[in-house]
Amino acid sequence: MIRTSSHVLNVQENIMTSNCASSPYSCEATSACAEAQQVMIDNFVFFHMYNADIQIDAKLQCGVRSAAFAMIDDKHLEMYKHRIENKFFYYYDQCADIAKPDRLPDDDGACCHHFIFDAQRIIQCIKEIESAYGVRDRGNVIVFYPYLKQLRDALKLIKNSFACCFKIINSMQMYVNELISNCLLFIEKLETINKTVKVMNLFVDNLVLYECNVCKEISTDERFLKPKECCEYAICNACCVNMWKTATTHAKCPACRTSYK
């Protein structure tokens, strides 16, 4: 949808324009909003990472989000001749196996004062990337949103431990919080785009419906139905669970009576 969504936004713009007379906003404002949404889509930095399973594959989602941190890491290598080495400032994705640190490391009583300088370098890398974005691709800062939230939490932990560097840490926090606020503005625009696309997709001819032969419920999500193991009889996951609850040994297909695994 990313590369063909211009029709969506053009239609939205026409709808907005036709309602200008009754809207509290000017026609120019609504038109500019639609144009900004289109620009945000057309210049998205990771549009090439689309995969048909991206909405259901957690590993793919993790890979896309991690690509944003890789951009920061690459910039760190470019600016400081080495990659980010402090694991405290790594990106820990919500779908990954490793949880993010919730406190500063205290092994062997090692000093963590250098964490402040590590954070400064990382933030400088983000600033360099951000400043390179022009007006048309400014929306790409949204890709840093997951990492910025982790960085905000990390700075809070550091601030509580090193009161002597309050001003330096406070300055970093102000920048990170401001960038997070900018990300939230773009997320709001993205939510508007998503709502419009969902409505427009109702008019696409290739819409597939999945119906359970037991309860007759219908869904547009292919995961709604249990994978077929025996015959073509379709059964949803909820009905399958109910069959297992009432089965003496194994649940069986209502059509061919084959036992489910």
Curated annotation (Swiss-Prot):
A zinc finger (RING-type) spans 212-257. It is found in: Host nucleus; Host cytoplasm; Virion. Signal peptide: none annotated. Keywords: DNA replication, Early protein, Host cytoplasm, Host nucleus, Metal-binding, Transcription, Transcription regulation, Viral DNA replication, Virion, Zinc, Zinc-finger. GO terms for molecular function: zinc ion binding. InterPro entries: Baculo_IE-1 (IPR007954), Znf_RING (IPR001841). GO terms for cellular component: host cell cytoplasm; host cell nucleus; virion component. It comes from the Viruses. Pfam families: Baculo_IE-1. One of its GO terms (biological process) is DNA replication. Interacts with proteins C42 and FP25. Interacts with host beta-tubulin. Interacts with Ac66 and vUb. Putative viral E3 ligase that plays an essential regulatory role in both viral DNA replication and transcriptional transactivation. The role in transcription has been shown to include activation of gene expression from early viral promoters. Also promotes the efficient egress of nucleocapsids from the host nucleus. May act as an E3 ligase that promotes ubiquitination of nucleocapsids proteins by vUbi and subsequent viral egress for the host nucleus. This is Immediate-early protein IE-0. It comes from Autographa californica nuclear polyhedrosis virus. The gene is IE0.
